[in-house]
């Protein structure tokens, strides 16, 4: 039984390493393809997550469920965008879900709605992304 447990544990660890490698490759591809989505507008910085743990950490910092979106972001079904204060780009402020050319939601800490100014900047971001996206397609 001990040998079986050791083999099973090793198999699970290998599966996790394979999944982590696959996620990293998907994130790397997304960053290259969607680099044009990163920009600064009205003192807010729109940033793409560079790896799966960025999304998990964002959910932890803001106490919301964005960590459940890792696979959808990695597959390209949706795009998760972090919205930061340009003067403090490392600090989590808002998280945006973008899908099918629309802003689905923007959430602040504890799932609160962001101020109107953030929505206004996000709408400007969307217009720029849709214009730039046509050029990059």
Task: Cite the ranges covered by each PLM segment.
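Catalytic-core elements of nucleic-acid end-processing and repair enzymes
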Residues: 1-137
């Amino acid at each position: 039984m001990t040998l079986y447990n050791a083999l099973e544990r090793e198999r699970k660890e290998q599966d996790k390493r394979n999944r982590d490698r696959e996620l990293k490759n998907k994130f790397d591809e997304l960053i290259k393809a969607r680099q044009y989505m990163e920009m600064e507008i009205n003192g807010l910085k729109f940033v793409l997550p560079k790896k799966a743990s960025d999304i998990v950490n964002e959910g932890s910092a803001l106490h919301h469920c964005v960590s459940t979106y890792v696979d959808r972001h990695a597959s390209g079904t949706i795009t998760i965008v972090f919205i930061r204060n340009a003067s403090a780009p490392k600090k989590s402020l808002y998280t945006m879900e973008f899908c099918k050319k629309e802003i689905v939601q923007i959430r602040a800490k504890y799932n609160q709605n962001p101020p109107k100014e953030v929505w206004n900047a996000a709408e400007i971001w969307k217009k720029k992304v849709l214009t730039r996206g046509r050029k990059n397609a």
